[in-house]
Amino acid sequence: MRIFSFCFLFIILTLSLFFISKVRAGEGASSNYFPGTYGDYAVAVPPNPGLTYINYNLFYSGDVDQAVLQGRVETDIDTFVYVNMSALIYTFENSIFGGSFATAAFIPISYVDLEADLIGELASSRVNDSETGLGDLILMPFSGYWNTGNFYFNLYELITIPTGEYDIENNVNLGHNYWSFDTVLAITYFNLESGREFSFVPGFMINTENKDTDYRTGSQFHLDAMFNQFFSENFAMGLHGYYFKQVTGDSGSGAVLGDFKGESIGIGPSLLWTPKVGKWYPTITANWLHDLDATNQLKGDYVVLTLVWQIGKIGK
């Protein structure tokens, strides 16, 4: 069914959004986790073999009372982020350990606008700056899929590479200047007869130190959950939510606000549409996620518009 062919891809698509985020606790009240983007529709259902191209547009607007940015304390922070992402995912045809296997790479082009009060030694000043360019790349070296009956499981590892521009003298940076390693398990229950689907996606992220600022963001637990109803193979609606908690404090001489642990929760609606375009069935989704509560991090709204185009087997 086309539900299987396309919907499962959104776990890979949406998890890719996390690494360009400027919106979690830690240095800059930010993290390489992007809330609510580790799942969409039938997130753990295995993909068809072959190549898939993904393009999406991400919009985020939020604010936070204070944070450490580029080694400086800033207050009354407002930010807007737009990202256009291109990604290629390849799913292997041969079974591995009784399941299917995929690998992927993601390239973001980002725009970030920041307004904040910069706290100096003698006085404070209001800054307003923006930047456009390449963000931090992400690799997914492995993603394994297994299923039994109506239950599906997806285990994968995400590696964020600090390729985005970073300069401690800048007011705005497109990269975080540290590596992140995120281990994630997605679990889906999908009843094809009723079209009803539940998914849960817990993950645990470990971050390295930003050596330019001597700031290490603490380890983070995140959980995404979604309930979806398919009305046909071409249309579905869902209610999605997330929970985020930083489990170890920030550290290093640059962590002048202490451990700065963050915690947040959010919820919002989602739509999926799979039109027929010639012989192709591209999938389009629209998601809105609103932060209900946030501590030590930006609080705001996320809108994500995505397009998934399954190319298929190479040479076929």
Regions found by a protein language model. Give the residues of each.
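Sec/Tat signal peptide C-region and signal peptidase I cleavage site
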Residues: 19-25
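Short loop/turn motifs that connect adjacent beta-strands in outer-membrane beta-barrel proteins
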Residues: 26-28, 42-50, 93-102, 146-153, ...
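Surface-exposed strand-loop-strand hairpins of Gram-negative outer-membrane beta-barrel proteins
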Residues: 27-32, 60-83, 118-130, 172
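Residues on the lipid-exposed face of transmembrane beta-strands in outer-membrane beta-barrel proteins
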Residues: 43, 55, 86-90, 139-144, ...
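Transmembrane beta-strands of outer-membrane beta-barrel proteins
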Residues: 53-55, 99-107, 153-157, 181, ...
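Outer-membrane pore/translocation modules
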Residues: 108-217, 258-260, 312
